[in-house]
Amino acid sequence: MSKTISILGATGSIGRQTLDVAEQLGLRVAALTANSNAERLEAQARKFRPRLAVLTDEAAAKDLAVRLADTDIRVLGGPEALLEAAVCPEADTVVTAVVGMVGLKPTLAAIREKKRIALANKETLVCAGQLVMDAADTYGAEIVPVDSEHSAIFQCLQGCADRREIKRLILTCSGGPFYGMTAEEVGKMTRADALRHPNWTMGPKITVDCATLMNKGLEVIEAMRLYRLPLEQVSVVIHRQSIVHSLVEYRDGAILAQLGTPDMRLPIRYAMTCPHRADNPSEPLDLLACPPLTFAQPDRDVFPCLRLAEEAACSWRRRSAFPTSPAW
């Protein structure tokens, strides 16, 4: 179980929810980073008292240094300062909740220090998954996914020592706010429409990506990288209720699923505590009050981003080799 964490991307949706979980679990915070939100990072730093606070925007970092001048918190600015937060010696776990490829270098730096990586930055695996997974193998670092779908799969794979036992991974997808529309109707939707996700509370970029199913396409590639399986063993189903977070089908016909409320603090909590569990003050899933659970095929004509991501995954597979060992 984690005891001290660094959070890269602390002022975003995942970062803020991670701090909620850290407070509930009594975890110490060693470092906090953000892009440019000096006001919010100041408030977080004053509450959690990290050793280090970083803003990648250097002008904002100067502002933060003035704001925190009455504390003993060290303030750094610039993109390279992310690396210092990632390798902060007090932290045993690094939560990578930044957006985009900016997460790659600090993730690799944390891996080299044998940190547990609570990975919420899917772009790191999409753009350099083989590099990251090979580095984790080399340095003996643990990567625990924070995405709800990949956390579900991670949990359903506990006890599976041989990937040949897996028939397929099944990623669930809510379908977003445009589910059931025609391509013509989707084409008339606005940014505001895309930001109205029916089930999840997330940051704006991932919410828009969910509306187009681009996020699900990235998650397909992420699953291939993280679990080292070909595209033929990763499928997507529409599950409007967002109760079943993903499933694993085994070669003997058994299907394991992880269920829970649509609350990102659940996978964040598991990434902090696994392989153990901790009490959760949030309202649990009430099976008797659940709506009927439905599953359907996604429409790749209405949502071509999913198809394009799968085509990109096929192209990547032709240029890359999967590990020959069946062990993880």
Summary of predicted features, one role per range:
Residues 1-328:
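Catalytic, metal-anchored helix/loop core of enzyme active sites in primary metabolism
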